From Swiss-Prot:
Record protein name field: Peptidyl-tRNA hydrolase
UniProt keyword terms in alphabetical order: Cytoplasm, Hydrolase, RNA-binding, tRNA-binding
Statement: the UniProt record of this protein carries the keyword RNA-binding: yes
Quaternary structure (record): Monomer.
Naturally occurring in which organism (per UniProt): Hahella chejuensis (strain KCTC 2396)
Location relative to the cell: Cytoplasm
UniProt-annotated site: Discriminates between blocked and unblocked aminoacyl-tRNA, residues: 13
Site positions for Stabilizes the basic form of H active site to accept a proton: 96
Enzyme nomenclature, EC number: 3.1.1.29
Residues that, per the record, bind tRNA: 18, 69, 71, 117
Active site: 23 (proton acceptor)
Catalysis: reaction(s): an N-acyl-L-alpha-aminoacyl-tRNA + H2O = an N-acyl-L-amino acid + a tRNA + H(+)
Length: 195
């Protein structure tokens, strides 16, 4: 059951070598949100990440990009949860998703990590709690399991970046519904969207 969102975490790896990779799709959406609101993510040592606060539908929403590497994202999310007293169920985690086409969007509440190391570490740091919302940003599958690592760590092609950016603008349209926890309409629209 979706709850109101009080924070959005965009997963990715830090540094310029990873900035435009498929694995950083969540971080790219977070940067898009901050820019749209005239804000910038700034380093915050206590949160082990880059942080800013924006307003959506009159609500303060915390944005966090963990500056730990992907497989240590949980430490940063736990720091955010503890410092701002936000339950995990109110933190939307945006991440790249291999199993859906580039530019495709899926909202999901709860479930396993599906092999995603960022999700795996968040679940671990919260004592096995899997009950949190996810924004799954499609990056497509390379078609061969042996190519997955090079695919997710590879730079996003111009065509796929255009698809992701179209998806980000589609998300903008439904962000208030997502933030308020009213996912039914947002899911119907987002899940039928194709960039």
């Amino acid at each position: 059951m979706a709850k109101p969102v009080r924070a959005i975490v965009g997963l990715g790896n830090p540094g310029p070598d990873y900035a435009q990779t498929r694995h950083n799709a969540g971080a790219l959406w977070l940067e898009h949100l901050a820019r749209k609101k005239g804000q910038f993510l700034r380093p915050d040592k206590k949160l082990h990440g880059d942080y800013c606060k924006i307003s959506i539908a009159g609500e303060d929403i915390h944005l966090l990009f963990p500056s730990t590497f992907m497989n240590r994202s949980g430490q940063s999310v736990l720091s955010l949860s503890q410092f701002y007293k936000i339950e995990l169920e109110n933190i939307l985690v945006a991440h790249d998703e291999l199993d859906i086409d580039a530019g495709t969007l899926r909202l999901k509440f709860g479930g396993g990590h599906g092999g995603h190391n960022g999700l795996r570490d968040i679940i671990r740091c919260f004592g096995g709690n899997k009950d949190f919302p996810r924004m799954r940003l499609g990056i497509g599958h390379p078609g061969d399991k042996s190519k997955v690592t090079s695919h997710v760590l590879g730079r996003i092609s111009k065509e796929d970046m255009d698809k992701l950016e179209s998806a980000f603008y589609q998300l903008d349209t439904h962000l208030e519904a997502i933030i308020s926890g009213q996912w039914d309409t947002a899911m119907n629209r987002l899940h039928s969207f194709r960039a």
